[in-house]
């Protein structure tokens, strides 16, 4: 009998991402390195003043989760994270972050990420590696990197699949440079994210219309448009 798969809630206190990563949620932080953060707020939909900072993941270990006033087994207290929906006219609200900060310890200089990609691919005996500059299904911007000279060729109609949380438990490289993005969480709540500009991972599937699946080293630029 196959044991049931663990949900994220079941992984409290366990390693879920690379040990170099710490993830925090900020509520009232309204600017980061000169960029306005649209996820900033001072009180949630239940009238709870959220803590300015909640550490969700520390050195890769799942420490806490966001919650409202209704206690949960893994989150007995509110983090002031029930927020009003942008589209609602009747006061509906959703559990949502303010600003998520994914911070890397001892990150790699951004100009060295590509050389790290090429080195890792050569060690695996591969002919090519791939750089993903945006994730958008079949419209993803994917570039094949020639390991001999580092030249890049755009892959047409590429689709990245198989990128899941386990891929983040052991990353080959994390950029020290950070990007800042504002977005609408689940199409309902203004949120922001601060995150490494690129990460180096392996065993990601690249689907193309004219070739079979390739499992190669991949350098991704998360959330970059």
Provide a role label for each language-model segment.
Residues 4-225:
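Dual-mode signal for accessory low-complexity, basic/Gly-rich regions
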């Amino acid at each position: 009998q196959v044991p049931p798969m663990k949900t994220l809630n079941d992984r409290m206190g366990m390693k879920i991402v690379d040990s170099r990563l710490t993830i925090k949620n900020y509520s009232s932080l309204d600017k980061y390195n000169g960029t306005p953060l649209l996820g900033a707020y001072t009180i949630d939909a239940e009238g709870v003043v959220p803590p300015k900072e909640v550490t969700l993941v520390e050195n890769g270990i799942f420490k806490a989760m966001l919650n409202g006033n209704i206690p949960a087994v893994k989150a007995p207290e509110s983090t002031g994270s029930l927020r009003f929906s942008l589209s609602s006219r009747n006061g509906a609200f959703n559990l949502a972050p303010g600003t998520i900060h994914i911070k890397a310890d001892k990150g790699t200089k951004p100009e060295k990420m590509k050389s790290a990609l090429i080195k890792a691919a050569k060690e695996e005996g591969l002919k090519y590696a791939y750089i993903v500059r945006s994730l958008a299904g079949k419209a993803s911007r994917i570039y094949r990197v020639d390991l001999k000279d580092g030249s890049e060729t755009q892959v047409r109609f590429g689709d990245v699949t198989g990128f899941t949380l386990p891929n983040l438990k052991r990353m080959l490289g994390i950029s020290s440079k950070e990007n800042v993005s504002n977005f609408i969480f689940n199409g309902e709540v203004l949120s922001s994210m601060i995150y490494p500009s690129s990460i180096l991972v392996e065993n990601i599937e690249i689907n193309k219309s004219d070739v079979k699946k390739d499992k190669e080293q991949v350098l991704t630029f998360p959330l970059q448009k």
